């Protein structure tokens, strides 16, 4: 009887010591975000993963070239990118590729002519 009580106590302590999932994340989802999927679509390529838990350590399961694969996760800044109502007449020119390329709270956002660093939209 005493051994069963100790096992039950140990199990409860182990479960209670697990940190809760971060707010807004699904169970098993890793922190960080996916890099932008700017690559061309490769047809008929099977997904390499379906969820983050299938990826090693610091990698996330993200869409890249139109199929899911394990890629290095990127840091995500708060706020959303403002909408761009312009149309580009020149070739695409990316001034950044991910939020970490931008200073301070600025985010790497899609614009009419490529990606550039912008202050996040308020709201």
Swiss-Prot record:
Residues 27-73, 74-121 form the WAP domain. The keyword Ligase does not apply. GO terms for cellular component: extracellular space. GO terms for biological process: antibacterial humoral response; innate immune response. It holds the Pfam family WAP. This is WAP four-disulfide core domain protein 5. SMART domains: WAP. Putative acid-stable proteinase inhibitor. The gene is WFDC5. Residues 1-24 form the signal peptide. GO terms for molecular function: serine-type endopeptidase inhibitor activity. It comes from Saimiri boliviensis boliviensis.
């Amino acid at each position: 009887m005493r051994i069963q009580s100790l096992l039950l106590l140990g199990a409860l302590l182990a479960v209670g010591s697990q940190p809760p999932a971060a707010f807004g994340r699904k169970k098993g989802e890793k922190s960080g975000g996916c890099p932008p999927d700017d690559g061309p679509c490769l047809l008929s390529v099977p997904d390499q993963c379906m969820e983050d838990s299938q990826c090693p350590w610091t990698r996330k399961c993200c869409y890249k070239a139109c199929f899911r694969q394990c890629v290095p996760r990127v840091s995500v800044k708060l706020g959303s990118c403002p909408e761009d109502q312009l149309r580009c007449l020149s070739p695409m020119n990316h001034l950044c590729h991910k939020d970490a390329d931008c200073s301070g709270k600025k985010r790497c956002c899609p614009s009419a002519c490529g990606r550039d660093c912008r202050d996040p939209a308020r709201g």
